[in-house]
């Protein structure tokens, strides 16, 4: 269900005192991505600043994404929380809005034990919406181990994982352990897209695709067509851009890049702060060289 290039979209804000939601800009950005051939849309993830969106803003962003996409590609909505009941509320709302699936980050800060993780993810999967797990140890302080993922994958509604550990050995093991299930392993790091595809992964939930969806889609489609040489060329063309997306905390650089390209972006919300002048110039040079 979820494969290919799926941009983790930014949430554009106005440059007003509240950094209020720019729904028209959101609509424009999504339509632009769809016109460039992306295979899915992922609102309200880390890149979409979900941590600083209110519940009502989550509803607005996901609802608008579903409306604009209009069935052309899947919408995978970020609905995770370290509060299980809040995650249930967000996930139920996304389902009611028409999202095709829910992206559920591993609970952060409170570091649940194994049985707590199983109960948390199972409670969400029992809402009868396809669930994609999200493993990002650098943000959560906890790594979803391959054997745990394999156990969760036996639930019929747990259909994949966004894997952002950066560990190709672990990613390969998850693919190996879930081969008997209808389960997609999706890279959570742009730079790992081609390696993950090579070991049997399904695609990437991408930051860089906000900036250059065309080349990201081209790399994926070249690989799927068996043209590894072309996929490698595009991988290395994209590499400087991929690195530039992490010269500061995500999504600070990608929002600035999108703004520099003339699309809707606006500020990041506190406690994140905007890119400083030196890094902005560094990013500008990468964009100019990228072409």
Curated annotation (Swiss-Prot):
One of its GO terms (biological process) is diaminopimelate biosynthetic process. Coiled coil: none annotated. Homotetramer; dimer of dimers. NCBIfam families: dapA. HAMAP family: DapA. Pyruvate binds at residues 47, 205. PROSITE patterns: DHDPS_1, DHDPS_2. InterPro entries: Aldolase_TIM (IPR013785), DapA (IPR005263), DapA-like (IPR002220), Schiff_base-form_aldolases_AS (IPR020625), Schiff_base-form_aldolases_CS (IPR020624). Its EC number is 4.3.3.7. The keyword Nucleotidyltransferase does not apply. Catalyzes the condensation of (S)-aspartate-beta-semialdehyde [(S)-ASA] and pyruvate to 4-hydroxy-tetrahydrodipicolinate (HTPA). Pathway: Amino-acid biosynthesis; L-lysine biosynthesis via DAP pathway; (S)-tetrahydrodipicolinate from L-aspartate: step 3/4. GO terms for cellular component: cytoplasm. The lineage of its organism: Archaea, Methanobacteriati, Methanobacteriota, Stenosarchaea group, Methanomicrobia. It is found in: Cytoplasm. This is 4-hydroxy-tetrahydrodipicolinate synthase. It holds the Pfam family DHDPS. It comes from Methanoculleus marisnigri (strain ATCC 35101 / DSM 1498 / JR1). It catalyses: L-aspartate 4-semialdehyde + pyruvate = (2S,4S)-4-hydroxy-2,3,4,5-tetrahydrodipicolinate + H2O + H(+). The record marks 46, 109 as: Part of a proton relay during catalysis. GO terms for molecular function: 2-dehydro-3-deoxy-phosphogluconate aldolase activity; 4-hydroxy-tetrahydrodipicolinate synthase activity. The active site is at residues 134, 162. Its main location: cytoplasm. Belongs to the DapA family. Disulfide bonds: none annotated. It is an enzyme of class 4 (lyase). Keywords: Amino-acid biosynthesis, Cytoplasm, Diaminopimelate biosynthesis, Lyase, Lysine biosynthesis, Schiff base.
């Amino acid at each position: 269900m979820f494969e290919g290039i799926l941009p983790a979209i930014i949430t554009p804000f106005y440059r007003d005192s509240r950094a209020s939601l720019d729904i028209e800009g959101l609509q424009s950005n999504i339509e632009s991505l769809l016109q460039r051939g992306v295979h899915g849309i992922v609102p309200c993830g880390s890149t979409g600043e979900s941590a600083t969106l209110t519940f009502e803003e989550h509803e607005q962003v996901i609802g608008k994404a579903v409306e604009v996409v209009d069935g052309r590609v899947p919408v995978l909505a970020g609905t995770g929380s370290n509060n299980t009941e809040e995650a249930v509320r967000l996930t139920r709302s996304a389902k009611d809005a028409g999202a095709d699936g829910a992206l559920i980050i591993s609970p952060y800060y409170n570091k649940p034990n194994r049985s707590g993780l199983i109960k948390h993810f199972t409670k969400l999967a029992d809402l009868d919406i396809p669930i994609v797990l999200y493993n990002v140890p650098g943000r959560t302080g906890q790594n979803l181990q391959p054997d745990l993922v394999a156990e969760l994958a036996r639930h019929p509604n747990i259909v994949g994982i966004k894997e952002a550990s950066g560990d190709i050995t672990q990613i390969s093991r998850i693919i190996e352990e879930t081969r008997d299930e209808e389960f997609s392993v999706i890279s959570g790091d742009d730079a790992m897209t081609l390696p993950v595809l090579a070991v049997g992964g399904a695609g990437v939930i991408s930051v860089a695709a906000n900036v250059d969806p065309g080349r990201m889609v081209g790399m994926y489609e070249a690989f799927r067509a068996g043209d590894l040489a072309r996929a490698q060329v595009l991988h290395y063309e994209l590499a400087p851009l991929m690195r530039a997306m992490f010269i500061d905390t995500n999504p600070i650089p990608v929002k600035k890049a999108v703004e520099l390209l003339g699309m809707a972006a606006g500020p990041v919300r506190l406690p994140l702060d905007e890119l400083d002048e030196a890094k902005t110039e560094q990013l500008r040079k990468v964009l100019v060289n990228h072409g």
